[in-house]
Structures are given as C-alpha cells and as structure tokens.
Amino acid sequence: MDGKNCSSVNEFLLVGISNKPGVKVTLFITFLIVYLIILVANLGMIILIRMDSQLHTPMYFFLSHLSFSDARYSTAVGPRMLVGFIAKNKSIPFYSCAMQWLVFCTFVDSECLLLAVMAFDRYKAISHPLLYTVSMSSRVCSLLMAGVYLVGIMDASVNTILTFRLCFCESNVINHFFCDVPPLLLLSCSDTQVNELVIFTIFGFIELITLSGLFVSYCYIILAVRKINSAEGRFKAFSTCTSHLTAVAIFQGTMLFMYFRPSSSYSLDQDKIISLFYSLVIPMLNPLIYSLRNKDVKEALKKLKNKKWFH
C-alpha cells in the first residue's frame, strides 16, 4: 500500500457489547458482579493457598498461578469494558490499546501452557508418588512457571509489535469490547497476511505443545491408575484429576473454536460472545471448579472459617 495514505491513529473507539441504552445498565450490573466474583474467588484462592501449610504442594503452587493468570487477564479486559457501558467517551489511546492486548495475550498464553504443566504434575504425583516431592521440587516448579511466563511474554510481544505497526487509515472504530487482534486486523488497511500467518503459526505451536503435553500426561496417568489393584484406589487417584480435566475441557474447547474455526463462519458478533466467555466467564468458573470439587480446598476453607482471629 502507498505510504502517503497511511495516517497515524492516536486512539481507537471501542463499540462494546451492545449500544442499546435499555440493555447497558443490566449488562453493567451483570458484568460488575461477574468481575467482582473473579477478583474475590481468584485472589481468595491465592491467599488461602499461601495461608494454609497443607496446601504448600506443587499442585497448589500451580493452582495459585492459574488463579493469578485468571485474575490478571480478566482485569486487562473487565474494567475497561465496564467503563464502556456508562461512559460517553468510548475511546482508548493507541498505546493503552496495545498494552491491553499485550497483558491479555501474555496471561492467556501462560494459562494455556500452565494447564499442560498441571497435567504433568498430576502424572508425577500418581505415577511416582514416592519420588514426587523430589522430582517436583520448588526449584523445578519455579523453572516450569518461568518457562510458561516467558513463552507467554514472547508470543504476546510478537503479536503486539506486528499488529500495532499496521496502518489504520480508514477507520479507528473497533467492533469489540477490547483490543483483540482479529477486529484490529480487519480494521487495518495494510496487508495482514504476514500477521495472520505468524499469529496462527505461533498460537498453533503453543496449542500443539499444550495438547501434546495433556495427551501424553493423561495416557501415562491412565496406565498408572490401571495398575492400582483396588477400585477405591483407582477412583481416589483419578478423582484428583477431575477438576483439572473440567478446566481443560472448558478452556481448550473455547480456544480451539475461537482460533481454528473456518474463516467462512467468522463473524464479529460471534467473536465478541466467545471472547466474553473466555475472558470473563472462564476466570469466574475456574476457582469454583477447583474449590467445589476439591477436598483439600474445602478443608482449608473450613479451618479458615473456624479460626479464631481475635483473642
């Protein structure tokens, strides 16, 4: 494209979820409640794990980082979306838009890989229980998390640089409630083929690593569970994985549908609904899944409830 037609954009206008005045108040109250639940539940989970020594294990170390990722990427999107319901000015500065996407992408990618790491942790706990604390030492856990966050930051940085160096010369109106890449690519008047190829390749690689890790880990888990003689022992061993499997099914199902659906079926309205689900609904569900189905967490909550805070 001719460079003289490429004018700089200082801000974008976020259309939001709905422009209907009668619906805005209802949506604002609904998503304010959802966002508060996300903060209370995920930060509460982190605090609970830190306070209860019984939860100072690799499994709950990774769970605390899952809660941190949920709280972080939902916070990148939630407050700005809530402001959009009540503010007349729906603009977001160019660099704020870039930062929003950078933070969001970093922690979504991190959560994607973290779910595979958590499956590996379950494999170690079930297949090699006697060596579990040695093989999953605090140093190993910290290195795994460092790798997870490093990949997330690298992918998000590449995505952000490639997207926000494009030309936006015809319109600055984003038909979305946050600065997501697909609507930005549609908005650009530059050739976006390289962006689409790089984004698809990197995210596809991350998904391949994640799904391969999940598949291999659970194959070994199933083999280990089958070797347990008693039915009660098999049930107890596999029950530790049910919360994780539920979280994986919801998160990965949404991600795969979002980024690997046929281009012919793509629509921005559908995109907004799916984005809403994985940016706010999933972070609300994860702590509920892990607390309602987890005996250790429920026991820790009970101890916290019965603790005498004032003497």
Swiss-Prot record:
Topology, Extracellular side: 1-25, 80-100, 159-196, 261-272
Cross-referenced PROSITE patterns: G_PROTEIN_RECEP_F1_1, G_PROTEIN_RECEP_F1_2
Keyword Transport on entry: no
Membrane disposition: Multi-pass membrane protein
Residues with attached carbohydrate: 5
Residue numbers on the Cytoplasmic membrane side: 50-57, 121-139, 220-236, 293-311
Transmembrane region(s): 26-49, 58-79, 101-120, 140-158, 197-219, 237-260, 273-292
One GO CC annotation: plasma membrane
A GO MF term: odorant binding
Listed InterPro entries: GPCR_Rhodpsn (IPR000276), GPCR_Rhodpsn_7TM (IPR017452), Olfact_rcpt (IPR000725)
Superkingdom of the organism of origin: Eukaryota
Subcellular location, principal: membrane
Localization per record: Cell membrane
Keyword set, alphabetical order: Cell membrane, G-protein coupled receptor, Glycoprotein, Membrane, Olfaction, Receptor, Sensory transduction, Transducer, Transmembrane, Transmembrane helix
Function statement: Putative odorant or sperm cell receptor.
Family in the record: Belongs to the G-protein coupled receptor 1 family.
Name of this chain's protein: Olfactory receptor-like protein OLF2
Higher taxonomy: Eukaryota, Metazoa, Chordata, Craniata, Vertebrata
